[in-house]
């Protein structure tokens, strides 16, 4: 009887010591975000993963070239990118590729002519 009580106590302590999932994340989802999927679509390529838990350590399961694969996760800044109502007449020119390329709270956002660093939209 005493051994069963100790096992039950140990199990409860182990479960209670697990940190809760971060707010807004699904169970098993890793922190960080996916890099932008700017690559061309490769047809008929099977997904390499379906969820983050299938990826090693610091990698996330993200869409890249139109199929899911394990890629290095990127840091995500708060706020959303403002909408761009312009149309580009020149070739695409990316001034950044991910939020970490931008200073301070600025985010790497899609614009009419490529990606550039912008202050996040308020709201």
Swiss-Prot record:
Gene Ontology terms for molecular function: serine-type endopeptidase inhibitor activity
Residues in the signal sequence: 1-24
Keywords: Disulfide bond, Protease inhibitor, Repeat, Secreted, Serine protease inhibitor, Signal
GO biological process, one term: antibacterial humoral response
Disulfide bonds listed in the record: 34-62, 41-66, 49-61, 55-70, 81-109, 88-113, 96-108, 102-117
InterPro entries: Elafin-like_sf, WAP_dom, WAP_four-disulfide_core
Localization in the cell: Secreted
Domain WAP span(s) in chain numbering: 27-73, 74-121
Main location group: secreted
Keyword field contains Signal: yes
UniProt GO cellular component terms: extracellular space
Function statement: Putative acid-stable proteinase inhibitor.
Protein name: WAP four-disulfide core domain protein 5
Source species: Saimiri boliviensis boliviensis
């Amino acid at each position: 009887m005493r051994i069963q009580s100790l096992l039950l106590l140990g199990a409860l302590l182990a479960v209670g010591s697990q940190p809760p999932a971060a707010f807004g994340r699904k169970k098993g989802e890793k922190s960080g975000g996916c890099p932008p999927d700017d690559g061309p679509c490769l047809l008929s390529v099977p997904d390499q993963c379906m969820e983050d838990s299938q990826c090693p350590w610091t990698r996330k399961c993200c869409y890249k070239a139109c199929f899911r694969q394990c890629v290095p996760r990127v840091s995500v800044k708060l706020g959303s990118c403002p909408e761009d109502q312009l149309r580009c007449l020149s070739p695409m020119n990316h001034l950044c590729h991910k939020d970490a390329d931008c200073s301070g709270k600025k985010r790497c956002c899609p614009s009419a002519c490529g990606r550039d660093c912008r202050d996040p939209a308020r709201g």
